Amino acid sequence: MIHDNLLLIISLLFVVSMLTMLSEKIGVSYPIFLVIAGLLISFIPGMPHFELDPDWVFLIFLPPLLYGAAWNTSWKDFWHWKRPILLLSIGLVVFTATSIAYLSHAMIPGFTLAMGFVLGGVISPPDAVAATSVLQGLKVPKRVVTILEGESLVNDASSLIVFRVALATMSTGQFVLWQAGVDFFTVAIMGIIIGLAIAHVLYLVHRFFPTTPSIDTALTFISPYLMYIAAEHFHYSGVLAVVSGGLFLSFRAHELFSYQSRMQTNYVWETVIFLLNGIVFIMIGLQLPEVMTGLTKYTLLEVITYAVVVSVVTILIRIIWVFPATYIPRILFKSIREKEPRPSWQTVFIVAWSGMRGVVSLASALAVPLMLKGSAFPHRDLILFITFVVILFTLVLQGLSLPYLIKWLKIEDDDENLDEQNAMLNSRLATVSLDYMQSNYDGEIQEFEPFRLLKDRYTKIIEMADAKLFHSEENVSKAFVLKYRKMLLEIIHIKRQEIQRLRKERACADELIKIKERELDLEEARLRKSP
């Protein structure tokens, strides 16, 4: 049994890797391609049944995926765009859940309003991985990606809270609006507090205990599970616990990790996140047999009609919400008009169109209990089918059309000039490096050609000379080589100090800061590995 399960997992990982390579070859976003591939594979006769356990999704997959997203999100950018992020991740989630609740209640016979809120809570959160993977490499404003990623960090929590409140209402038969509101904010705020508390403990562990790159990497994998399980144990939001803790530790990462830890952690996490996302999306497609089970109470025309109507309305709801939420605050508040550039309607439409649903929706639908008060949960199979169609409909229609839509709308990147920021960043780093050389190695600059060459490069505001520079000097002494390497390592340290000053000044985009940190990590790794 164990052998069979292990073989199944390895086969699944292999298939995910192969299909992802194929998606890169044909130019289709891999989440969309994997869902379609999984759907086609499910039709193959004799294929084993892949059951997606919602407990596995929420406990095994969701914490690291959320933590990885939070880790790669700039807190500065998240806070800067907090208004549109919260309007989408909380306001739009509640609006979508409410709209779908009343629509399904009116359209489907026997579908109560509470059942409608269960369905609305299930399908309300978009999946950012699908959207950002489509947008990757396309010419869109950076703030669009930032807002979509920020939305995804919070909307899962909002939708799951709505989902739980709806289930509780069906179980008790009672719903009090003010109590639901209090519960909503209590669950959210306490989840954030628990996440930050655990993050502070982990910060102290990383900062003051002797660790190695392997230990640091292991702790980063343990962290999201600690945050999620602790919050869920007390019936608070595990999602927000992971997100808040991940944002805090990411913001403090430069204080905690050595260059070896940063490099190892980044490489390992990139691989793990890719595999988890790949498994999740192909498993969505493989769920068709499970979804079709139990639909005997309805005709095929009925279930398809319900699912397509809900899918179309779900897309329209986002469009209807996004445009007023973007422009009305600008009309009402002068401060917003002064601080933020006016977004074009094309850019706003891209945000509105990037509402593809994903694994959280399917896992929530599967988490709907089989029994309610001793009898079968009403319309559970229909809720599951509608959710599957909404996921497939939005992923295929919106996901495949998004690149062409961006080209057709001729969207221009009107964000701040990152090239200018990058030039300034290089200039600042070159300046502090040159100052350090002249203060501490002035004699060597006058005596040795490599020192003079490096000084000239900094003077011209170019990158630090490659570590192999001293390898080409065959006639220099071992002492010179060691001293030259020592100087380069010291300059890297000086550059890191300047980067932290720039981070505090908020003079550059965080993405540029992180890229530069990785470059310095690679430079240091090459130097320390040199004989």
Regions found by a protein language model. Give the residues of each.
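Transmembrane helical cores of multi-pass secondary ion antiporters/exchangers
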Residues: 1-418, 483-484, 499, 503-516, ...
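Cytosolic C-terminal regulatory domains/tails of membrane transporters and channels
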Residues: 416-531
